[in-house]
Curated annotation (Swiss-Prot):
This is Probable pectate lyase D. The keyword Ribonucleoprotein does not apply. It catalyses: Eliminative cleavage of (1->4)-alpha-D-galacturonan to give oligosaccharides with 4-deoxy-alpha-D-galact-4-enuronosyl groups at their non-reducing ends. One of its GO terms (molecular function) is pectate lyase activity. GO terms for biological process: cell wall organization; pectin catabolic process. Belongs to the polysaccharide lyase 3 family. Its main location: secreted. GO terms for cellular component: extracellular region.
Amino acid sequence: MYQKSLLFSLLATSALAQFPIPDSKGSVTFDAPYEVAAGKTYDGGYKTYGRGVSCSGQGEGGQDDAVFLIQEGGTLKNAIIGSDQIEGVYCLGACTIENVWWEAVCEDALSLKGGSGPYNIIGGGAQGADDKVIQHNSGGQVNIDGFTVYDFGKLYRSCGNCDEQHARTVTIRNVVANSGKTLVGINSNLGDTASIDSSTCATDVKKICVEYKGNNSGDEPEEVSEGPSDACQYSEPLSSC
């Protein structure tokens, strides 16, 4: 009886740790980034989209390496980004990313590159990010709601050393985070703020909110503090997932 109970316990633990990516409905390989026009919506039908290339690791790619380019006000929804790509999805202006899943993150999953937001990430998820999942280079507000992230470096990072810096704001709700280094990284000296709602849970995440001293010189930004503050707005501890 004990062995049977132990087996059920192990199976339950394994199930909880399983990244809940939807089943793929097919695959599409683009020769070049697919552009979602301003104000338009692309419904991926839960197919897996890639570029037919191997991940180049943490070497900085560029716009030409993305799978999707989303123009101002565009929406990408119901899509799976495959492992055969480098730069994932770029938002070149305010965008909505809804129920988009990353099979495996290469350099970054989602890069916010232009405009002033808002950038809305609703549902979906990503796994296997050595560093960042969401990289925020432009200014404005990011809203992350209902996202699932497993095995990651940082869920969200406000650019720490971009040539042109901005005050950035991120709000996180209903996020499920499992096995990561840092949930959020912001530059408090540049006016960034992060708000993490108690609906977010974190299991085996080493740091919840880290403040950096951002710069525009290209130097590696200095980590100055972690934990709740005027800039990192949340209550400890977050619940386990």
